């Protein structure tokens, strides 16, 4: 009985787990949708129904497909050099793009402003790709959700300015402590936060939030009169706490190692030399290295068949 009971529990678990996963994706989708509708659409006096009405106006012409793409991007960057933060910037860009397809023809229109008037005028511009004469239909917006592949927190707000500057100073400290030959450190930290809303002619709507962070490190090593550079870094769709002390140390060590290796590097052999190629793929190398040049000469001299 014990074995049977355990089997039943496993079977029930296999049935319930997909439902739990689906519910989790549904909740994340709802959170994303609400955030994008509030901070992208409503903040600019728009609603999903407004986009559907503009698409309906496009649909009065003979078009096969149309969509409206709304986007807002917030970007922040910090740059450290010579022990101090020498530059920092913050900007917000937003706009809308409208597309219509009729047969093999595609029309685009876009605006740097995001409001009902710019969307209406863009829709009127692209719909001329198709002939007029269809009856207008306003489709009720319906959203679909898929698997969440990254988190949606705003990385710009995940650390305050002092913590971001401290992270860059930490990079410099680690690099100079790694080897006394490191004489200069340059580090950059960038954060991006995209809000996206897409509406299609068939009534399908979709929302997405795309965070992006990157830490870039460049070091200069000096030995005698020779100076060499090394660089490393990384990032992804995370918030800034992703850059743990362990990960930052790995980036720094990679940049330092590259610079120190370059200090010991010698020029590669150059000039005329004998090269022996075996059969098979080396023949391809020979063709790429020599054959294309010969083909070009033949074409230039108009002697090619």
At which residue positions do the language-model features occur?
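Active-site bordering "gate/hinge" segments
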Residues: 15, 20, 24-305
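Acidic, Ala/Val/Gly-enriched low-complexity intrinsically disordered segments
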Residues: 2-6, 11-12, 22
């Amino acid at each position: 009985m014990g074995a049977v009971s355990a089997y039943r529990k496993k079977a029930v678990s296999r049935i319930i787990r997909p439902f739990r996963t689906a519910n989790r994706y549904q909740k994340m989708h709802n959170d994303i949708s609400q955030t994008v509708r509030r901070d992208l659409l409503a903040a600019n006096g728009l609603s999903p129904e407004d986009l559907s009405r503009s698409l309906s106006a496009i649909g009065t012409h003979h078009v096969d497909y149309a969509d409206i793409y709304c986007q807002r991007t917030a970007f922040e960057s910090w740059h450290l050099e010579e022990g101090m933060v020498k530059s920092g910037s913050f900007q917000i860009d937003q706009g809308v793009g409208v597309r219509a397809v009729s047969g093999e023809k595609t029309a685009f229109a876009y605006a740097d402003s995001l409001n009902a008037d710019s969307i209406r005028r863009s829709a009127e511009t692209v719909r001329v790709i198709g002939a007029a004469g269809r009856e207008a239909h306003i489709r009720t917006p319906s959203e679909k959700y898929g698997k969440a592949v990254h988190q949606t927190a705003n990385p710009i707000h995940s650390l305050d300015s002092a913590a971001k500057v401290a992270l860059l100073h930490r990079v410099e400290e680690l690099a100079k402590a790694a080897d006394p030959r490191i004489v200069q450190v340059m580090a950059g930290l960038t954060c991006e936060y995209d809000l996206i809303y897409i509406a299609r002619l068939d009534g399908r709507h979709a929302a997405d939030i795309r965070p992006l962070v990157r830490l870039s490190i460049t070091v200069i090593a000096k030995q005698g009169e020779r100076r060499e550079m090394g660089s490393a870094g990384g990032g992804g769709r995370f918030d800034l706490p992703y850059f743990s002390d362990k990960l930052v140390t790995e980036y720094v060590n990679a940049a330092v190692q590259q610079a120190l290796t370059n200090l010991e590097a010698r020029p590669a052999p150059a000039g005329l030399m004998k090269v022996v190629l075996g059969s098979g793929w080396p023949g391809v190398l020979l063709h790429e290295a020599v054959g294309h040049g010969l083909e070009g000469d033949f074409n230039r001299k108009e002697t090619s068949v």
